[in-house]
Amino acid sequence: MRSGSPTTISAPAVVFIHGAFMSPESWDPWRQRFEARGYKTVAPAWPFLDHSVDELQHAPDPRFGRLGIGEIVDNYAAIIREQGQPPILVGHSFGGLFVQLLLDRGIGAAGIAIDPAPPKGVLPGANAVRASLPVILGWGSWEKVRWMPYKNFQWGWVHTLSEPEQRAAYDQHVIPTSGRLFFQALLAQLTDVTKVNYRNHLRAPLLIIAGELDRTVETRMVLANFRKYARSTAVTDYREFPGRTHWICRQPGWEEVADHALDWLAKQLGAAP
C-alpha cells in the first residue's frame, strides 16, 4: 500500500486530505487516477496516524484522542507551506472541512470538498448527530480515541452495499478517531474553530460535492454549505451525485466523481501536464 507520509510536493500537485475514521490509504484509487492524468499526488496523514491501517486498528496512539481541528489544519498548512507552488486540495468529510479552512487562509490553488463536515454557520442535521453519538457518548470521550461500531458504519456510510461488501470495507479501512474532533464539530456554533470567511473574494476556486444518499453529511447540509458562499465573487461550484453515500470516494462508480473533479480542475486551472 502507499505510504501516507508527507513527501516533497512539486508543481502541479494534489494534496489528498482524509477524514475521520479513514487513513491516507483510502485515497489510493484517486491518487492513481489523478496521476494517470499527469498530476503528482501526496496524501499526508493526520498527526499520530502515519502508520498502516492494521497498526492503527490494533494500537492507536492514545494522544490521538486529544487531537483537535486546529492542530490538524495547522499541520496541513505547515506541510503545504514548506513546499513550492500552491497545490490543489482534495478532501472528504472532515477533510472537506479542512480544505475550506485552508483555502480561507490563502493556502491552495484550488479545492474540492466532498461530503464536507460543516463549517461554522452550517447546522448539522439529525442524522449527522446520530452518526456522531458513538464517538461522543461515554465518560471522558473528549480526550479519548474513539471507534465507530460496525453497525454505525453500515447505517451511515455503506447502506447501499451488500453485507459482505460492508464488512470488507470496514475491516480494510476503518480506524479509530479523535473524540475531541467530534466534540469541536458538534459545538462549532459556539466557537471559531471551524469559522470560514464566506465572503472571502480572494479565495481560490472551490468545488463542493454531495452524495444524494449520504446519511452522515446529508445533502441539505452540503447545499447549505455551498450557499453560504453566495456573496463571494470567488469561484464556488456545487455538484450532487445521485445514489452516492458517505462512501462516495470508494463505492462503485467513484470514477465518475473523480473524473468530474478532474474536468473541473482542467476548466479552472488548465489541463494537467
Region annotations inferred by a language model:
Residues 7-55:
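Short, surface-exposed "cap/lid" segments of acyl-processing enzymes
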Residues 19-22, 93, 212:
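Active-site glycine-rich loops that stabilize anionic/oxyanionic intermediates
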Residues 70-87:
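Conserved acidic catalytic loop of the alpha/beta-hydrolase fold
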Residues 90-95, 99:
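Gly/Ala-rich beta-loop-alpha elbow adjacent to hydrolase catalytic centers
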Residues 107-141, 181-189:
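Flexible "cap/lid" loop of the alpha/beta hydrolase fold
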Residues 202, 208-210, 214:
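Short beta-strand/loop motif that positions the catalytic acidic residue
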Residues 215-224:
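Conserved alpha/beta-hydrolase "acid-adjacent" motif
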Residues 235-273:
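Catalytic active-site module of serine/aspartate enzymes centered on a nucleophile-bearing elbow/loop
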